Every structure is written in structure tokens, then in C-alpha cells.
Amino acid sequence: MVNIVAVRRHGVHVRVIHVPPVQPQPILAPLTPAAIFLVLTVDDGGEATVHEALQDISGLVRAIGFREPQKRLSAIASIGSDVWDRLFSGPRPAELHRFVELHGPRHTAPATPGDLLFHIRAESLDVCFELADRILKSMAGAVTVVDEVHGFRYFDNRDLLGFVDGTENPDGALAVSSTAIGDEDPDFAGSCYVHVQKYLHDMSAWTALSVTEQENVIGRTKLDDIELDDDVKPADAHIALNVITDDDGTELKIVRHNMPFGELGKSEYGTYFIGYSRTPRVTEQMLRNMFLGDPPGNTDRILDFSTAVTGGLFFSPTVDFLDDPPPLPAPGTPAAPPARNGSLSIGSLKGTTR
């Protein structure tokens, strides 16, 4: 909303127009007990349908959420590299590229298909399901669902390995600066990047460990979620390899909204990793540390029990962009080359084992 205020200056009435900043999607909304993650590919010829449907997302959220506001329904729509130039003319996000597949000495982070990501969450699954259904119906005949995960809160925000997940999330101004693009890409200020991976856990191997051994894998105590002291924390502990700093030693953060999921009949126990960041380079350095090792070969011990089966990188534009997007590209317009070819080019980012 634009606020127009009448003031009197030097005897003259002047209208001062306050134009609000762009509205980001609800990246920083608190965790909820329920979530649905939808990954879609856009079929050939489906671009116009998807382009139109994306403009209706915020209206669908309002319409469904208004019926039961106490359930705090929200949704974040994100777009992948391969489909961006099929959907929008004009500028392209500076760091948008395909997910960087990693092949380490023992473990692999695969890249899997995905053009659109919908992160839908609420206090209960019913409104998530209703919104997901409406979104898919609005894109019927234009998209294919390639992955669908229904996540749930597990006790006090624990994963199915039994540890609290998301403790190190920033909050307040630090959360904003960790996720919102600024002057470095002014065409997309207020937007952010998001990585997703679906991990499946080997619960038989995990439960065979003692609690102390499990704590050494994670780097935290299991019951009360306290980080282990540096002198006892193993170098290959999960949290030790996820500390990323810049050249000045300042720790760089991402915002995780991970959710457990599972299917008992298939003995499937998993964690859906979803990490929002101002630049994809921070999350990519974390993944390099985990899968390739820091130093090389010192890989994340958690990967001996958790296998990544999907991987995607998407761009989460502002609400303003989605409500009024650039037009579709003209027929025959060649796709603009990505600003980066998928190489990590970390530059000033580095991992710090602690």
C-alpha cells in the first residue's frame, strides 16, 4: 500500500508519497507443524499457463487462509534456472544456475530435475493440501510433479535422528541480511535463493550407535541440544563442517526450514533440507565441506547414515515480482546464458572447522 501524507512546507501544501520497499515472500515465517514441498517440471508448451498461474498464487493463499486464519497458511514459490528464460523476459537473477552435483570420495549430492518449487506450510496439513491441490489444478496440463513430500513437526523441532534441527538459524536483522538480496543485484532486491535436498536415513545403522557416538556425529548433545566443546567435537561432525566465514572471519548464515517425513510401510525415514540464502555460494560451500571434505577427504560423518536422493537450486522472487511478472519472452528469443555455469567459484567464502 502506498501512503500519501499531506504536509505544509514554507506555507505550501505538499503531498509526500511513501513508497514501501518490495515485499519478500514469507521466507522468515516461523516453522509450522505441517508442510508440503512440491517440485514440478514445466512441460513444453506449458509456459503461458504457468506464467499466468504464478500471478494467482498470493490470491489463492489469501482465499484459503482467510477461512481459517489461525492455521497461518503461507507459500513460497521458487523458479529454477532452466525454466527462467522460458517464463520471463528481461533481466535474470545474477547467480541463478543449476544445482551443482557433487561426487565425493564416499558420498554423492545428486542434481535432480525441477523447474518450480512450492514450499507450503501451515499449522495443519489440511490447508496445505488444499493449496497444493489448487496450485496443481491451475497448472493442469502444463506441469509434471517430479517430487512431493509431506513434512511434519517431530516433537520439539527434532529430526527423525532424534536431534533438534535448526538451532543455528539467524533471527531478526541477521536473518534478513542472510536471505534478502540487496544492491549486489538491484533488479531482484528482496529476493533470495533456495537449495533443497531430500535425505533418507539408515535408521538401523543409526540406532546401533550409542548416544555418545550419535552426539559426536552431529556435534551437539542429544537431550538438551548444547554444542560440544571444540576440544571434544570431532572434525567431521556435522555442525563443524557447516560453519562458513568470509575473509574477515564473520560467520555467514542461511535460514533452514527442514522437516521430517516418512512412510512406515516403506521403512522410509527422512529429512527434507531446505535452505534459503542471499547467495547460493554459502550453501554450496557447506555442501562442498560435507560431501568433498574440509580439508578434502574429511567428509561429514552424518552422510554415513543419511543419503541425499534429490538436489535442486531455485530462486524465490518477491511477491511484487510474482504478482506482476515480466512478460513471456517473444517466440524464438534465445535463452540468456546463466551468469554462472555451475562451477562453485567460492571466492571469499571459506569453511572453518571448529
From Swiss-Prot:
Pfam families: Dyp_perox_C, Dyp_perox_N. Residues 312-335 are annotated as: Targeting peptide. It catalyses: 2 a phenolic donor + H2O2 = 2 a phenolic radical donor + 2 H2O. It is found in: Encapsulin nanocompartment; Cell membrane. Its main location: other. InterPro entries: Dimeric_a/b-barrel, Dyp_perox_C, Dyp_perox_N, Dyp_peroxidase. Its cofactor is heme b. This is Dye-decolorizing peroxidase. It comes from Mycolicibacterium paratuberculosis (strain ATCC BAA-968 / K-10) (Mycobacterium paratuberculosis). The lineage of its organism: Bacteria, Bacillati, Actinomycetota, Actinomycetes, Mycobacteriales.
